[in-house]
Amino acid sequence: MGSGFYAQLRSLLLANGCVLVRQGKGIHEIWRNAISGKNFPLAVTVQSRHTANGILKDAGVA
């Protein structure tokens, strides 16, 4: 799997109704918020908490 914050982000996203849509290019995955229908990318190598917070914001979770 990834390193850094990936496992925590994945758990939070799944707990909040987000689903993995497909594998993106390289180290990215494309996820969808089931409530809003919005797609967003998630890198499997998230090292910064600021990046992790930005992903949660894009996902509509934070």
Where are these regions (language model features)?
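Basic nucleic-acid-binding interfaces
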Residues: 1-25, 32-62
